[in-house]
């Protein structure tokens, strides 16, 4: 449960219709095994103590009492289990029969939640036996315990307040206004659905989409436990399709008829963080009763996959579609700005590296969208002390293949003159030596844009902005930054996508060579004609920094949790030892805080994903904020591992 992780499971035990004793034994067997695995929330299907397909037998007092006896037996047997358990049964309350979910924990009955929407169409006739539940909460006596009964119930863990459980049953989710919507608005971060959804052609896909979409709409974790083998097959079959979703993603799922269970860890902290940033998600708890319970705060072993590249879809088809969409977004943003400014040219500094390559590809797309010639893009290469033959050649070939206008401006003499003006020794390879070149390049581009009636297109990406890896008022500045919302790990895939769809073999080849070129600002003199300044040797691997960036900005997690996630995500990568992960995480926080002043005055640029650093939009941070708390948490983490 540390860091907000909750190990949860949805079960579909094999049962016997109307055999409550047998069914309770099946539930307990799965519960005991789950408890050994550290499961803290276990959800079983609708009517799992009786079977869903009892029909008019539900009206028999013998079956009703059998279900209560089974529940009482389960309460006694689970006294020592550190798990919240949900089971389904019929319950007679004040002369009316309800389809209910009972919530158990450590031998205590926490509450009873009746079903709100009773299906009475097609193969379902629940209104024949049952009464819809009411939002009004009342107290009833069940198994000798006084418990709350009603749909407006929430269950909160004292040891992990971010774990707040809401309950609904089967048809409730399929209705136009599910009770889970109100549960989430009242504070529930996890929804449990006890279901008996029969299987028909196409229903599994619909069910999967329904669960995923509801978890996305409610910013919650969603467990769906459905009836399976053992239900009567007189008119229907039940496949035991169990699902666990979180914020729109299916984390765990059983194949229909597999006879297994779904199990994973839900991140309750993340749900809390998502809701904190979403101001349209109002907290409305009026009329709700919250029941608190205790669980041992043990550390949860993570089995869920932690994606090491959260900005990049793993599936090739999805990735290709994502790349095309992003390129269109970038191009449309630039096209609008060129059109509005009546710009005659789009001026881009081309280095032969990844970022300027992507910006050039976007600019060509923008001109095509405006029905203008690619020649209206003016690509400028400005070789100086650190430029290598490889990058210079690639820049020229790329421009030729794209059909853009090309100009070379050798800036070495201009830089030397500038150094003479300020008294900089050319042999001293310090920050002034590096930044002086970057600022001269920006000066050339800005004035060239003025002369040609154009706009300077910025090339810096999101990862560089996060780390401050840009010269203030140098490559940091432009008139429109097309890459400002694109992290470095995604830049690579965008260029690769353009290579795979290239119109000519020469364009394909040069794009692949650019991809193969080490990332470098080329501000220090080359050694034997090769790049001497490798960015990732200086600031760290971009795949690590993009991982950290995602969880810092998208989720608001602290250093300790991000470090834990990184260890899980990069497990098996020999180059990423714990010490390496820690080193670059600390570096990330130090640079992120220290370099905010550069982000406070960013040029305009399009947002393309959920993480961005625009000071006018998603990220508003003072330039002089202190990183002390974050670095102190990292220091404590280091001490704890020693």
Predicted features and spans:
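Enzyme catalytic cores with a strong preference for nitrogen-chemistry domains
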Residues: 1-347, 365-374, 401, 406
């Amino acid at each position: 449960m540390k860091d907000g992780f909750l190990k949860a499971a949805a079960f579909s035990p094999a049962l016997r219709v109307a055999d409550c004793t047998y069914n309770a034994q099946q539930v307990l067997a799965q519960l005991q095994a789950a408890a050994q695995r550290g499961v803290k929330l276990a959800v079983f299907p609708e009517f799992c103590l009786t079977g869903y397909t009892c029909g008019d037998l539900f009206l028999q007092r013998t079956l009703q009492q059998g279900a209560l006896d089974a529940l009482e037996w389960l309460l006694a047997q689970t006294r020592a289990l550190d798990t919240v358990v949900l089971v389904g049964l019929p319950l007679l309350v004040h002369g009316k029969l309800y389809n209910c979910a009972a919530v158990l924990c450590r031998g205590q009955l926490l509450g009873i939640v009746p079903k709100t929407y009773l299906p009475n169409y097609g193969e379902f006739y629940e209104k024949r036996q049952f009464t819809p539940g009411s939002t009004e909460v009342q107290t009833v006596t069940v198994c000798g315990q006084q418990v709350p009964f009603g749909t407006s119930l929430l269950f909160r863990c004292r040891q992990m307040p971010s774990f707040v459980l809401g309950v609904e049953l089967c048809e409730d989710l399929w209705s136009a206004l599910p009770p889970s919507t109100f549960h989430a608005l009242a504070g529930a971060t996890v929804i449990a659905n006890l279901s008996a959804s029969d299987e028909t052609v196409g229903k599994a896909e619909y069910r999967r989409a329904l669960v995923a979409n509801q978890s996305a709409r409610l910013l919650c974790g969603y467990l769906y436990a459905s009836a399976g083998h053992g239900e009567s097959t007189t008119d229907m079959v039940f496949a035991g399709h169990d699902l666990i979703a979180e914020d729109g993603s299916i984390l765990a799922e059983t194949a229909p008829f597999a006879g297994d269970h779904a199990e994973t860890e839900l991140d309750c902290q993340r749900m809390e963080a998502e809701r904190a940033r979403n101001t349209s998600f109002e907290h409305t708890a009026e009329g709700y009763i919250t029941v608190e319970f205790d669980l041992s705060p043990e550390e949860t072993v993570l089995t869920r996959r932690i994606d090491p590249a959260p900005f990049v879809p793993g599936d090739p088809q999805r990735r290709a579609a994502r790349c095309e969409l992003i390129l269109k977004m970038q191009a449309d943003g630039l096209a609008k700005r060129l059109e509005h400014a009546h710009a005659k040219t789009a001026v881009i500094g081309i280095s032969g590296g990844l970022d300027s390559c992507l910006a050039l590809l976007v600019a060509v797309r923008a001109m095509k969208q405006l029905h203008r010639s690619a020649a209206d893009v003016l690509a400028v290469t400005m070789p100086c002390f650190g430029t290598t033959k490889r990058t210079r050649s690639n820049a020229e070939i790329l421009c030729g293949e794209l059909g853009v206008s090309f100009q070379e401006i050798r800036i070495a003499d201009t830089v030397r003159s500038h150094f003479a003006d300020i008294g900089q020794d050319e042999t001293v390879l310090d920050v002034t030596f590096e930044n002086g070149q970057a600022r001269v390049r920006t000066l050339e581009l800005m004035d060239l844009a003025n002369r040609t009636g154009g706009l300077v297109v910025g090339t810096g990406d999101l990862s560089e902005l996060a780390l401050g890896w840009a010269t203030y008022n140098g490559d940091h500045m432009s008139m429109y930054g097309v890459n400002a919302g694109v992290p470095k790990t995604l830049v690579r895939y965008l260029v690769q996508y353009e290579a795979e769809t290239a119109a000519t073999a020469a364009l394909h080849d040069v794009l692949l060579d650019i991809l193969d070129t080490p990332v470098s600002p080329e501000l220090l003199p080359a050694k034997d004609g090769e790049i001497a300044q490798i960015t990732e040797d200086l600031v760290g691997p971009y795949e690590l920094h993009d991982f950290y960036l995602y969880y810092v900005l998208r989720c608001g997690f602290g250093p300790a949790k991000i470090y834990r996630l990184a260890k899980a995500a990069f497990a098996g990568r020999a180059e990423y030892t714990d010490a390496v992960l820690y080193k670059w995480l600390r570096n990330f926080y130090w640079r992120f805080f220290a370099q905010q002043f550069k982000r406070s005055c960013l040029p305009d640029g399009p947002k393309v994903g959920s993480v961005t650093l625009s000071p006018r939009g998603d990220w508003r941070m003072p330039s002089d904020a202190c990183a002390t708390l974050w670095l102190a948490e990292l220091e404590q983490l280091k001490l704890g591992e020693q």
